Amino acid sequence: AGSAHWWMKDTPFKDWYHVFDTYTGSNIAFSTNMDPNASKKDLYIQESGWFDKSMVDMNLDNPYVLNYFKQWAIWWIEWSGLDGFRVDTYPYNEKDPMAEWCAAVMNEYPNFNIVGEVWTASIPQLAYWQGGNANKDGFDSHLKSVMDFPLHDALRAGLNEDWGGWGQGMVRVYDILSHDFVYHDLSNMMIFPGNH
């Protein structure tokens, strides 16, 4: 949500979005979501910090905000006949409410697709966010698809360099594909040539 949007002038609750004394951006450390050693402060700033000074961070821990997002999603799907959502910066949100949101949408529309932009080169961290994955902490995002950034990065590098030995050129792509065993559902990995 943009800070200049009309609804930000008169929110239903003071905690409709995350409020700080001064601007606090996300630390963009979404590995704190799955790291058993992460500090609570780092996780809080990751989830609650704003993406940008003009882009407030909605407080999905507020049950009214979460319910609003569920109703909003269902309305858009019904009104426009959408087949899916792309959720940018997916791991920047509170993970449990987002999992509840995904589950609610998928329960209402089992053939719908939600793809999360999980911008990481780490294959295990990417796999963590795909729904149905056997995560050690028991977390299930209910997120059907994730964007395959490791493969995207390997394709870009592999197509733009000569093979000079193992780990270079198209061998980069092979190396990434050899890790496919960590994903719950390969058919729902979104392969893409570019982002934005």
PLM regions: where:
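Short beta-strand segments at enzyme active-site cores
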Residues: 1, 86-87
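Active-site-proximal helices and loops of the catalytic beta/alpha 8
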Residues: 72-83, 89-192
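Glycine-rich, aromatic-lined ligand/substrate-binding cores of catalytic
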Residues: 195
